[in-house]
Design a protein with these regions (language model features):
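Conserved beta-loop-beta element that borders a ligand/cofactor-binding pocket
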Residues: 133-159
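Substrate-positioning beta->alpha
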Residues: 163-169, 182-205, 212-213, 226-227
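N-terminal Rossmann NAD(P)H-binding glycine-rich loop of SDR-like oxidoreductase domains
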Residues: 3-23
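Glycine-rich Rossmann NAD(P)(H)-binding loop
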Residues: 6-7, 182-187, 215-222, 233, ...
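NAD(P)-cofactor binding segment of oxidoreductase domains
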Residues: 63-110, 130-137
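Mid/C-terminal beta-alpha module of Rossmann-like enzyme folds, strongest
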Residues: 203-296, 309, 358-363
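Amphipathic terminal alpha-helices
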Residues: 324-363
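Active-site "gating" loop of Rossmann-like NAD(P)-dependent oxidoreductase/epimerase domains
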Residues: 98-123, 138-143, 160
């Protein structure tokens, strides 16, 4: 199949390009051409800044595609223009969304028919992803535009452009640092391996059953916060020095009753957000660096958040190949192969503040 990946040079997009090329697809990527990366042999490169409508029109002119995977659409105007340019010229348009769209729920797992969150607590990223999905559903229903939306949850694996997730945990354990765990460590979460997610996206291609539908895409296994730490420690081969943050202190940190000095954050992602989070929300996101958590602006620190993937299994025949321990093992092997066990630099000052508070906390 003739496929186009919007982006295609970092993490999710790069894994998808490699998966498609491995299975014989004629793959093109479209991006600004600024990220140095080795792509599989035969992958064609189209260059344009998608925020420049004229440049995007020129780059896509005279092309038809069997499938277009849009990994870099963050705003409604992105998908509006893609629908305009691709109408009648694409067999399937797959929009990569995010599970941040969903409202908090006490019923788990969260499936595709659960309510989305349009409340004031939703952030700009989530609001705009919802608007993108709304538009594509209308386009499919009213004009037959062959669109599918795929919300990803926390993605895990080699080349992650958010080093403060799994890579930071490897670094903590290797440095012998205390491992901070929120509350009693029983809260459940879930990640998906980037290569499993690339396979799922490939398997969705040109399946008419998926048109106009949403598919959650993440791992099949859940883990507790303490289980997350224990799994990492077993893979790294160390005994973790676990420090449990008292629930009362976590409540104070989440509510902003205790505010700490900020630390540097490692990230290479640009979601073109114009919104700047307030100090309390920023602190909540810093807390998710301790043990991975999704959407702390919506979900309280001690609320389990997991997503169902049964629809994807049923309609595309996909199932994850990586268990959670296998995903950690695979990612740690990559981490060491890249020399990150020696070169990754982390700012621990914020964690040190939390550690001091946890040790001195009076119940």
């Amino acid at each position: 199949m003739k496929t186009l990946v919007m982006g295609g040079t970092q993490f999710n997009g790069l894994a998808l390009v490699r998966e498609l090329a491995k299975h014989g697809h004629a793959v093109s990527v479209l991006n600004r051409g600024k990220t140095p990366v080795e792509l599989p042999l035969g992958v064609a490169r189209l260059t344009a800044d998608r925020t420049d409508g004229a440049a995007l029109r020129a780059a896509l002119a005279n092309h038809d595609w069997d499938v277009v995977y849009d990994v870099t659409a963050y705003r409604p105007e992105d998908v509006h223009l893609m629908a305009e340019l691709l109408r009648g010229r694409v067999g399937h348009y797959v929009f990569v969304s995010s599970t941040v769209i969903y409202a908090p729920s006490d019923r788990l797992p969260i499936s595709e028919d659960f309510p989305v969150d349009r409340s004031p607590q939703q952030n700009e990223y989530g609001r705009l992803k919802i608007e993108c999905e709304d538009f594509l559903v209308r386009e499919q229903r009213e004009r037959g535009f062959p669109a599918t939306t795929v919300p990803l949850s926390m993605v895990f694996g080699p080349n992650n452009i958010l080093p403060d997730r799994e890579q930071r945990m490897f670094a903590r354990l290797l440095a012998g640092r205390p491992i901070l765990i929120p509350g009693d460590g029983s809260t459940l979460a879930q990640v998906g391996h980037v290569e499993d997610q690339a396979r799922a996206l490939r398997m969705l291609a040109q399946n008419p059953r998926t048109f106009g539908r949403r598919y959650n895409l993440t791992g099949a296994h859940y883990f507790s916060a303490e289980g997350y730490v224990d799994t990492f420690a077993a893979v790294v081969g160390v005994a973790p020095n676990k420090v449990f943050i008292p629930a009362g202190l976590m409540d104070d940190l989440y509510a902003g009753r205790v505010l700490l000095a900020r630390a540097a954050v490692n990230a290479k992602v640009d979601i073109r957000s114009k919104e700047r989070a307030g100090e309390i929300i920023q602190q909540r996101f810093l807390l998710t660096m301790l043990v991975q958590r999704i959407a702390p602006h919506l979900h309280h620190w001690n609320k389990s958040v997991v997503f169902g993937v049964d629809r994807l299994r049923e309609d595309a025949g996909w199932k994850p190949e990586f268990s959670f321990p296998a995903a950690v093992e695979h990612t740690y092997a990559w981490f060491r192969s890249q020399g990150l066990h020696e070169s990754l630099k982390c700012d621990w000052s914020w964690e040190d503040q939390v550690l001091a508070l946890a040790r001195d906390y009076k119940h």
